[in-house]
Amino acid sequence: MSSTRILTALLLLSASLAPACKAQLGKNVMIPAGSDADHQLNAINAADPSQKLALIDTFAKSNPDPDFQIVADEQYVNYYLNAKQYEKAFEYGEKLFALDPNNYVNAVNMVRAAAEKGDHTKLFTYGEKANSILANYKAAPPPEGTNPDDWSRIRTEKLVSLRDDEDYVEEALIGGAYNAKDPAKRADYLVRFSKMYPNTPESEQALAVAATAYLQAQNRPKMLEVANGVLAKDPDNIDVLLLLADDYSERGEQLDKADTYAKKAVSLADTLKKPDNISDEEWQKKITIQKGWALSSEGQVSLQKKQSAQAVDSLSKASTLLRSNAGLYARNQYRLGFAYLNLKKTAEATKAFTEAASVDSPYRAMAEDKLSELGTAAKTPAHKKPS
């Protein structure tokens, strides 16, 4: 994390002040080199952690000027952050913002405190604050009397110097969003993340996950809003195509659209490029499940349309592909059982329901009920995980 903005320089005959630091945003507090304040800060920086707080207290009391209080609050924030006393860090961070609203380093430190504490509310509040400070700086006109070309160069250099902090904030935000346990909050955080980083691959992926989280939170209107928004920008987003195909086919709504989305997902699964950060084995497993999921949705569309033979064909193809995912596999076999029943193929239906009941999933009990109705409950094998 970036250091506190303590500006010092050689003591000149005219008692000159230290130059501004290019790597910071916010007020540049000038500390006269060789002054009492300079000596106090040097002592703070050199002190053992057990002695720092008393020295910071002394500095704050002996330098009441608002600019020096900025430096004091920065020292308090760093001390409490390193001591993992996060509430105290937040307290002094807010005091610092009151004196220096555009202090980017303070915003980054608050993000760090919130991330380490696991406080997602504060994490996004301060993350948005950090991004707002950067955005305002990028949009700011040249200061009065500054040549526009010089200003462009200075601004570029400063933004480059802040890149590591900017990357840290982004990573902290996306990590916090994905780790939020409540699906409704997770979805909201991911949408907020996307708004902060629009037109990026991370933004698109965040929205795709947000759509799924909204569905988990039983907020279907928001799921549809977010998912359709993703497809409007990226019609080939396989995750969203699968989500909508599954939702529509399961509910018996917009079946033609569901079928189109499912078929497109099957085609995309064969052409997707493997990301660099995933192994060949993991990638193969992922696309195998995606293709099986899409075929299962195709089969469900056919079931809804009373096209049982087509349903059997799609669901049978999906069966092999979904074996590594208990929930999807069990649901697919449950659907396949009904497709066979519609064709009056009781033996095949019994086999499909038996397979659905053989794995630990929400479909186990329903499959067992169907087997009981068919008079074959005694033949149900011991429950097991799919191979």
Regions found by a protein language model. Name each.
Residues S62-Q69, A98-V105, A135-T146, V160-D164, ...:
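Short solvent-exposed coil/turn linkers within tandem alpha-helical repeat scaffolds
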Residues L17-Q75, A83-K84, T125, Y137, ...:
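N-terminal leader/linker segments that initiate helical-solenoid repeat arrays
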Residues A46, A83, K117, A180, ...:
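Structural motif corresponding to the intra-repeat A-B loop/turn of tetratricopeptide repeats
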Residues K27-P32, D165-E171, D188, P275-N277, ...:
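Terminal, low-structured helical/coil segments at or just beyond the last alpha-helical repeat
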Residues R112-A139, S249, D259-D270, S316, ...:
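TPR/TPR-like (Sel1-like) alpha-helical repeat modules
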Residues D38, Q75, N109, E171-G175, ...:
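"A position-specific structural signal for the A-helix of alpha-solenoid helical repeats
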Residues N78, R112, Y178, T212, ...:
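Residue-level recognition of tetratricopeptide repeat
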